[in-house]
Amino acid sequence: KYNVNDALDVTNGEIKIIRAVGNPEIKTITSNMVSGFDSSKENTKLPLTVSYTENGETKTTKYDVSIKDTVTAVSMKNTPKTEYKYNEAIDVSTGTISVTKGSGTKDIAITENMVSGYDPTKLGKQTITITYGGKTTSYEVNVKDYVTGISITPNAITGTYNDELEALINGNDIIYTVTYAKAGATSPRALTESMVAGYNKTSLTDQNSTVTYTDQDTNSYTNGKTFTTNLSVKLKNEISKVTITKPTK
């Protein structure tokens, strides 16, 4: 068996010389005895002729070889996506590998059926193996948990005209909870005034203030992204003072 563009190899090849008289003789085949070898293209059954000349007389015998354009090596050309969120399918659409065969080297696109070793439910670094033509190369990916949203409790409160936001938050013990795709809900934390926008202490109409949370978890896929929910606020117009004008009588 030969690869495309391989040189002829007659190592361990022998012929048996049978003469009219005497015992048979074993001769080592040399490359100059062989004709018909052409490894420039594939051939499943290429006949080679072995010629032996003695005393001006030449005898021949034949054997067959196969020529196949076989993969000898693969290497990563363009690494595909390496950062994934929990339970995300692998994406190799931007990846290419360099494939070396007997005929030369060319770049081909990575397809999903070449990939092994990926588990979208396992957080952390993983080694991904690419297999092509019996040869392999690999690269590393990182699967991270991610924030799916936030919630606040309570999410609707009442107050009095001109109440400060901080007083409303503290007086109602408002907490917020961050939920991750895999880890689930985290321990509740106290809401801070800086997280709330859109509150007007002098408005008596129903208000929907926006609560914003920025993911600062460096191990999270959504690190740096913001998530919002609404805080419903209703201020009452309570009597703050009564004055009197005395009757004239």
Enumerate the predicted regions with their spans.
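Short domain-boundary/entry signatures in modular proteins, especially
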Residues: 64-73, 141-149, 231-240
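Serine/threonine-rich, repeat-prone extracellular segments and beta-strand-based repeat modules
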Residues: 22-67, 81-82, 103-139, 182-228, ...
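Solvent-exposed, low-complexity, repeat-rich "mucin-like" stalks and linkers
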Residues: 1-23, 72-105, 148-185, 238-249
